[in-house]
Amino acid sequence: MTDTNEPSGVNFKKDVKFSIIIPAHNEEKYIRKCLDSIAKASEAYKDQIEVIVVLNRCTDKTEEIAKSYNCIKLKNNDKNLSKIRNAGAKIASGEIIITIDADTQMAESMLSNVDKYLASGKYIGGGVTGKFERISLGIFFSAILIIIPLLFRYGAISVGIFWCHKKDFMEINGFNENMLMAEDADFAKRLKEWGKRNNKKFGTIKNGMITSCRRFDTYGDWALLKNPKVILAYLKGNDRKSADKTYYDNQER
């Protein structure tokens, strides 16, 4: 059941260009770096940015941190990342939607690149490529083990941070709320298909993010290769038990 509270810290600024949506479930260890990266990327767009932190069953200091950065705060208790992100998009007032995970940092040039891509009229939106905070053989092969099956199932896409006009986000009904995992790849595929129908390309901004290695730090760099069932569940997309274990009930992820 959805439990969505009225947003607090609502931004009444006019002419908001970017609405940046962050789903957050107990992210006190990571979200400051994410918000600091957004602040740096936003310097050329003063008073044109709103950051919406969708608080998901938080029991730590995530809400307090979001408040200290003057973010718009919205509570949603669904164990479903699609519903969490869509709740943020629903209240967004910007013409451009950007979604980023709380353990990810955007590049300083990220917003200017999004602005450039969309202003060209050639792109429907897109994703980014990036890097992990650290790399090892285990992390490298784990990434390959995920990427190759995704390419076969969803085609040539990029994920990580998504960006598109809000009107296009709404046209494809946002993230698929029937999916509990791999909802990002599904969103990318549908956005790309929507772009083709409108004679626009799906764009990929290179070197657009740095993401944490928290799962590798917790479980080991080779853990994914030792447990291929996780990969199969991810590709399936609607395995509730695996989704809860991997994301929604896991405080050490």
Model feature map: region roles:
Residues 76-92:
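Glycine-rich, basic loop-to-helix element that forms the pyrophosphate-binding segment
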Residues 97:
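Short aromatic/hydrophobic "clamp" motif used to bind/position activated sugar donors
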Residues 168-173, 179-199:
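A short, conserved alpha-helix in the catalytic core of glycosyltransferases
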